[in-house]
Amino acid sequence: MKLLKEQLMKISKALVFDIKRFAIHDGSGLRTTVFFKGCPLRCLWCQNPEGLNTQRQVIYFKNKCIHCRCCQQFKEQINYQNDRPYFQNHQDFDQVIKTCPSSAIQYDSQEYTLDKLMNKIKEDEVFFQHGGGVTFSGGEPFMQGEFLIKILKRCQKEKIHTAIETSFYTSLELIKKALPYLDLVYIDLKIFDEQKHQVCTNVSSQLIKENIRYVLQSEYKDKVIIRTPLIPTMSATDENIHQIVKFLIQINPEVKYEMLNYNPLASAKYELVNLKYGLESYQMFTKQQMQHFYDVALQAGIKNLIKE
């Protein structure tokens, strides 16, 4: 079946909402982390709300705005209320962005061709020669799966270490295509219970668990680290950690497992995209609280526990 021109464009270009250089938490060594736009989940605690939508949107930096009201001339694109602009995101905003003198109005992402993104990645190749590499994150990288596989192949050809951070909520077909070109695979298993996962992320955990079962029984199992972000009252419960560990070690007793402390700093990003963040009252866990969760995982039978 022939691909439509629009479909070919989607494969040859990717929407990227951030490229973070010198990252140290997304794999070994100093890394360049590429954040792909679009995610099938809607986690209540999402750390990157600007990466949720699959389309390019407009964001507003309140701290940059000088209240010149230049944007008020664009009445079809902007509804100005309470001393701030609200955007109709189906409109073309090129002229609006050019008009804003303080860059308070910007697109939330950029289009990258394979060559353009590869050139950007290779700006840091000196670090890749000393244990670093590139990590593909999001959003959900598999939402732009065909492009992802193409850039992974290019990285492997250039001998650049590759990692991915993924929810694994995607087709097994795409996973199988990507795995040969990945050196490290971080997979989030947030909440074991399917109904609770549905409530907290808007999708069931069934597909994620099926895909995890496949990869932990495959030849690529040693590349995998399963992660659970610890969110107060949601994923950070003894029962949830116990269920996840029992599930994992039943598939592969040598599985590597990591728990990530809650990060309360994401709330500032929600204002940029005009979304409400409902977890402002939650705080990071203390060292003692984290040790408790480690103990729960160890008592459940995990052998390879990665600690912060």
PLM features: residue spans?
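Conserved AdoMet/S-adenosylmethionine-binding subsite of the radical SAM
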Residues: D115-L272
